[in-house]
Amino acid sequence: MNINRDKIVQLVDTDTIENLTSALSQRLIADQLRLTTAESCTGGKLASALCAAEDTPKFYGAGFVTFTDQAKMKILSVSQQSLERYSAVSEKVAAEMATGAIERADADVSIAITGYGGPEGGEDGTPAGTVWFAWHIKGQNYTAVMHFAGDCETVLALAVRFALAQLLQLLL
C-alpha cells in the first residue's frame, strides 16, 4: 500500500539519526516487536544506526545488504520478473525486499530501502536521489518514494532518517 502523501513524514532538524533510533528503539521494545532491515543503496547505514542505539539486541536481530540484483534474489527472494519488469529501484522490489527480510529474519517489522544515491541515476532515466522505501508491519507492506537533493552522502543520510521517521509514524 503506497502511503498517502498527507501521511508522509516531513523531516525536521531535530530528527537526527540518533534521536530517531532512540525513539524507535523505545517504541519497538515497548511493543515487543523485532525489527529487520533490507538495504541496497544505503549499504548498511541503516543497520549501523540501529546498532548504535541502546538495547539493540532487544529489538534488532538481523540486517541484509543486497546491492546487486543477484543478492536481492538469492538472499531476499526478490523475483527476477520484478527486477526485469520494474527495475531494482521500484515500489515492487522495495516491497519484496521488506517481505523477504521478514521471512529470513523471523521478525515482526522490516524496513527496506532501494534507490540511486548518486552521482548517477538509473539507466531508465530515473534521477539520482530517487529512493523507494517499504515497511512491512503485521502482514502489511507500506511503500513510499522520495526524491532527495544533494550529494550521495547527503541522499543516503536523508534516506536513513526518512526510513526511521516514517516507521515511527506508522507504529503510532
UniProtKB/Swiss-Prot annotation:
It comes from the Bacteria. Belongs to the CinA family. Does not have nicotinamide-nucleotide (NMN) amidohydrolase activity. NCBIfam families: PncC_domain, PRK03657.1. This is Protein YdeJ. The gene is ydeJ.
